[in-house]
Design a protein with these regions (language model features):
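Asp-based, Mg2+/Mn2+-dependent phosphohydrolase catalytic module
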Residues: 1, 100-187
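Short, acidic loop-to-helix structural element flanking the phosphoryl-transfer center
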Residues: 66-90, 96-100, 128
């Protein structure tokens, strides 16, 4: 199976760290559970929802980049899926350097044929341009993400879709743990 992966919240459990940083930036004025829910929609959505100033956005980005990869661990059993798939690619809004830092830390670079990162010049999701580029090059079968934003472009170009730890409508498959990947995903 040839798989396109989102990065944050799909391969790596980064949202806890993001939530803690935004909670700090907001001076504890918003409960972490509420921050998490808004961040899961998108960072852009969360910044508008919480009316972050440019200074607060800059503070968030600075603090988030300073978090050790140790605090951004891969989800359990996802490495088993990476090992068993034919090919893996990443499409993320995260800057390439940040992706590489985390992949280097865990020794995971060899699992990915290509990474399209946020600073590569492609339009942001849900625009399908980056997905189409990767699909044309690698003949993908499945896109896995944790947000509807991750599956909309995949659907548009005809890929099967899987939402991870998200039960929103629209995906072909749903997973709460990667331990169930091959029991659940039938393509």
């Amino acid at each position: 199976m040839n798989i396109l992966w989102d990065f944050d919240g799909t391969l790596f459990d980064t949202y806890k760290a993001f939530t803690n940083v935004l909670h700090e930036v907001l001076k504890g004025s918003v409960p972490p559970d509420e921050i998490f829910l808004e961040l899961k929609k998108s960072f852009t959505h969360a910044t508008a929802f919480f009316q972050l100033s440019e200074d607060q956005i800059a503070e968030f980005k600075l603090k988030e980049r300073a978090i050790s990869p140790e605090k951004k661990r891969p989800f359990p059993f996802v490495e088993d899926v990476l090992k068993q798939s034919n090919l893996n690619v990443i499409m993320t809004h995260k800057p390439r350097e940040e992706v590489q830092t985390i992949l280097d830390y865990f020794g995971w670079n060899h699992y990915f044929q290509e990474i399209v990162a946020g600073d590569d010049g492609f339009p942001r999701k849900p625009d399908p341009t980056a997905y189409r580029y990767l699909h044309d090059k690698y003949k993908l079968d499945l896109a896995v993400g944790d947000r509807v934003l991750d599956i909309v472009p995949a659907k548009e170009i005809g890929l099967h879709t899987c939402l991870f730890q998200n039960e929103a409508e629209g995906a072909d498959f749903y997973l709460d743990t990667y331990e169930d990947f091959y029991k659940t995903i039938k393509i």
